[in-house]
């Protein structure tokens, strides 16, 4: 009897492994991704099964919100000129079309944009706008802590809810796991609608833990929006133990807020299974500037990796400069190659990273990519006063990209992210000035400094690079 059970479990086990291998093959992934999974499943089946369950499943064909619902929400945006019409510079019209076709990200005209480079100024601006709210406040953060900063926000929202303002909050269930349940319950008791995005009951027993909502947006009365890299926690305002927290966030007034509204309402519909609509959520707004922007929300569910495709497309067509700020650099092969080719072609490619991030493992993996970058002529600068958490891309003298997405596998493949693509010469000049000011606080490394690193350090970097897609 025992022998029969042994054979039975062996057959079931083998069929399971073969079935997963067949699924991986028929997903038609990049062979560089397919082959390692097959090797791990064959050589270490138990470990392979566990890792595949958490990190390997391809959810691109699944949807958390139907196309019909998404279209119904985005159709509430005021339909502007087609991106091939006047306004967007001819060089960037294909990029605008790419974002339109992959994300239904329509060009939005005439927004006024304020830029914040520290958490204190961003928080003060946010609190001022909350105090002015009259109809609704929509808030979405990856991290919503119950520390002093989080409690300050909570108290302001509770006060507005008591005034009759409709307050809705989405937070990521994994990113905000440090906050006590009582923190959210107190807001619900005050009449605020609070939901966790992709709720995870048992983090150790679900593959959903690998797919998180990394967006950081606020929309107030459909007229004012915030987007960028800052969450709600004390460290974004006060800094870290080893220095300041340097980040970038936008306050958008005008039509750009409608793009943030559409993203929030899509996530709200996916989370609560309720659809919110009405002209009060997309009020008429004036045109304040000549800025043209596209709000680009991307995620793991769907055919396209739109932010990766858009960044790669823009980088490959740069003519003068490509300036990047990112806390983590764990790029895809396509993006990494595009940057090296640009540098080899004589384009000014400059990558700014934190001298120290919040993860030593990620630092090691990031550094493994820098040798080839420097050999190609890419300038590498390390920000020294604290943690550089800013996510910024400047292409030539026209395109600026800011938002929640890092230059890493997780942002491009697994997370729900949102970036703003701004087409404007004057605005690009403003962002370049910020980049240049940050450079005064950086150390730009030379090949003579970088290449003689100890062999043990290089081995550690290479080892961590193997795990880049999981970090």
Language-model regions, residue ranges each:
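Helical hairpin unit composed of two closely spaced alpha helices linked by a short loop
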Residues: 318-320, 328-350, 354-355, 359-361
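A general structural signal for well-ordered alpha-helical packing
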Residues: 308, 315, 336, 349, ...
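N-terminal localization/anchoring segments of enzymes in phospholipid and broader phosphate metabolism
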Residues: 1-309, 313, 317, 357, ...
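Thr-Gly-centered strand-to-loop micro-motif
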Residues: 324-326, 383, 402-403
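A beta-strand-loop signature enriched in Asp, Gly, Thr, and Trp
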Residues: 345, 349-395
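Short, solvent-exposed amphipathic alpha-helical segments in soluble enzyme
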Residues: 338-342, 368, 437
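Histidine/acidic-residue-rich catalytic or RNA/ligand-binding cores of hydrolases
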Residues: 333-336, 363-365, 395, 413
């Amino acid at each position: 009897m025992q022998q029969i059970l042994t054979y039975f479990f062996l057959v079931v086990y083998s069929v399971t492994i073969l079935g997963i291998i067949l699924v991986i093959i028929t997903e038609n992934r990049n062979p560089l991704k397919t082959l390692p999974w097959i090797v791990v499943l064959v050589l270490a089946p138990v470990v392979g099964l566990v890792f595949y369950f958490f990190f390997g499943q391809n959810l691109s064909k699944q949807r958390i919100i139907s196309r019909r619902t998404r279209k119904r929400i985005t159709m509430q945006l005021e339909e502007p000129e087609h991106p091939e019409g006047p306004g967007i510079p001819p060089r960037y019209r294909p990029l605008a079309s790419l974002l339109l076709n992959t994300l239904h990200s329509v060009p939005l005209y005439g927004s006024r944009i304020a830029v914040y480079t520290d958490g204190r100024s961003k928080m003060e601006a946010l609190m001022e706008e909350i105090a002015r709210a009259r109809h609704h406040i929509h808030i979405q953060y990856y991290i919503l802590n119950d520390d002093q900063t989080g409690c300050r926000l909570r108290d302001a929202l509770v006060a507005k809810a008591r005034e009759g303002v409709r307050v809705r909050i989405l937070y990521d269930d994994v990113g905000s796991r440090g906050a006590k349940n009582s923190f959210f319950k107190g807001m619900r008791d005050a009449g605020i609608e609070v939901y966790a995005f992709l709720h995870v009951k048992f983090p150790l027993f679900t593959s959903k833990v690998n797919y998180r909502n990394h967006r950081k947006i606020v929309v107030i009365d459909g007229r004012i929006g915030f987007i960028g890299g800052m969450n709600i926690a004390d460290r974004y305002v006060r800094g870290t133990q080893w220095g300041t927290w340097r980040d970038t966030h936008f306050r958008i007034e005008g039509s750009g807020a409608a793009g943030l509204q559409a993203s929030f309402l899509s996530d709200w519909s996916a989370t609560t299974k309720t659809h919110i609509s009405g002209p009060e959520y997309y009020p008429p707004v004036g045109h304040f500037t000549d800025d043209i922007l596209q709000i680009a929300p991307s995620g793991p569910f769907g055919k396209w990796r739109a932010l990766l495709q858009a960044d790669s497309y823009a980088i490959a067509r740069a003519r003068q400069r490509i300036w990047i700020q990112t806390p983590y650099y764990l790029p895809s092969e396509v993006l990494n190659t595009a940057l090296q080719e640009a540098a080899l072609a004589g384009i000014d490619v400059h990558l700014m990273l934190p001298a120290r991030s919040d993860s030593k493992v990620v630092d090691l993996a990031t550094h493994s990519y820098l040798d080839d970058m420097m050999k190609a002529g890419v300038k590498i600068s390390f920000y020294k006063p604290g943690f550089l958490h800013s996510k910024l891309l400047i292409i030539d003298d026209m395109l600026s990209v800011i938002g929640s997405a890092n230059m890493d596998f997780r942002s491009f493949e697994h997370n729900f992210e949102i970036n703003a693509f701004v087409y404007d010469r004057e605005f690009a000049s403003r962002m370049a000035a910020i980049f240049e000011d940050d450079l005064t606080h950086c150390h730009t490394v030379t090949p003579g400094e970088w290449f003689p690193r100890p062999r043990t350090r290089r081995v550690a970097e290479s080892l961590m690079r193997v795990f880049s897609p999981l970090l």
